[in-house]
């Protein structure tokens, strides 16, 4: 790493890109997300030595949405082993949209990767638990442990909104069930899926979760929360597929493992250096925080930390 980061540097990057929020949009297909303030933006960085840097609205809670997929992927591998998980879902990037059924129809019905919705539904079905409630409590507890925040909860309004309007996800799940890719009760699997996408986090929480993945699964005290090999797998999947059909552009412009969510969050991992959490609800036409994408591009260029 060539340059050090500080609050003034972060302020400059954020304020330089904040006007882009005017051109962003809020997602209309999840009504609960339409109440966000497009001008909000926050960033939080946790370095491996424990030092933190932050600016803006880094403590505003928002729903984690698809960023939860990296947590459930790690759990599914820890619960079942990578061989079983990747016998149900692939590792390959795709040019299709995150909620497209086309990859399932064009192949053997197995989702190409765990980051698209179909793949994440398969991964969710593999989380251990006697009931959907027990499954979700394990996911919530694990999220709290990774973020070192026992107060993380679910946004019940967002959950109900997603459950009510999630017909595309429902169609994906029933397609997967019909093809024998997933086992169990479809509605219970979707209940768990919608709930873990509705977990409330902050940019600070994301930065602390990213820290774990940057530190090969260890927390600040050295406790191994995720096996190092699992972290490596998740980072690789993030790098290839974390931004769906925008992943290639993100790799070129930003160049670190990261995952976006339509709630406006981005989690970024700089292996061996830092975890990054960002929140900016104004989205570009691919469903990524428009300010967050550009701030990360400037930040990684300044720090010279791109993995490529």
UniProtKB/Swiss-Prot annotation:
Task: Give EC number(s), comma-separated.
Answer: 3.5.1.2
* InterPro entries, sorted: Beta-lactam/transpept-like, Glutaminase
One Pfam family assigned to this protein is Glutaminase
Task: Give UniProt keywords alphabetically.
Answer: Hydrolase
Q: Does the keyword Hydrolase apply?
A: yes
Annotated catalysed reactions: L-glutamine + H2O = L-glutamate + NH4(+)
A Gene Ontology biological process in which this protein takes part is: glutamine catabolic process
Q: Does the keyword Zinc apply?
A: no
Please tell me where substrate binds in this chain: 66, 117, 162, 169, 193, 244, 262
What's a Gene Ontology MF term here?
A: glutaminase activity
The family this protein is said to belong to: Belongs to the glutaminase family.
Subunit details: Homotetramer.
This one is known as: Glutaminase
């Amino acid at each position: 790493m060539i340059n050090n980061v500080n609050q003034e540097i972060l302020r400059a990057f954020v304020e330089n890109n904040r006007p882009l929020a005017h051109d962003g949009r809020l997602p209309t297909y999840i009504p609960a997300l339409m109440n966000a303030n497009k001008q909000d933006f926050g960033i939080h960085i946790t370095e491996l030595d424990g030092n933190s840097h932050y600016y803006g609205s880094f403590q505003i809670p928002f729903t984690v949405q698809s960023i939860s997929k990296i947590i459930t992927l790690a759990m599914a591998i820890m619960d079942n082993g990578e061989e079983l998980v990747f016998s149900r879902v692939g590792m390959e990037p795709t040019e299709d949209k995150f909620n497209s059924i086309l990859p399932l129809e064009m192949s053997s019905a197995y989702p190409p990767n765990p980051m698209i919705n179909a793949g994440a539904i398969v991964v969710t079905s593999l989380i251990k638990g006697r009931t959907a409630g027990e499954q979700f409590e394990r996911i919530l507890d694990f999220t709290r442990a990774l973020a070192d925040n026992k107060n993380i909860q679910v946004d019940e309004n967002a959950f109900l909104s997603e459950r009510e309007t999630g017909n595309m996800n429902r169609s994906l799940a029933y397609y997967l069930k019909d093809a024998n890719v997933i086992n169990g009760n479809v509605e219970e699997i979707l209940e768990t899926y919608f709930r873990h996408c509705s977990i409330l986090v902050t940019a600070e929480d994301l930065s602390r979760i990213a820290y774990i993945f940057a530190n090969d699964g260890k927390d600040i005290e050295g406790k191994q929360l995720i096996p190092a090999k699992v972290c490596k797998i998740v980072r690789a999947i993030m790098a290839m597929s974390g931004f769906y059909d925008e992943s290639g552009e993100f790799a070129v412009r930003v160049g670190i493992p990261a995952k976006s969510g339509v709630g406006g969050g981005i989690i970024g991992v700089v292996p061996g250096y830092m975890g990054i959490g960002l929140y900016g609800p104004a989205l570009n036409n691919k469903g990524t925080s428009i300010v967050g994408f550009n701030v990360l591009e400037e930040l990684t260029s300044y720090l010279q930390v791109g993995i490529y």
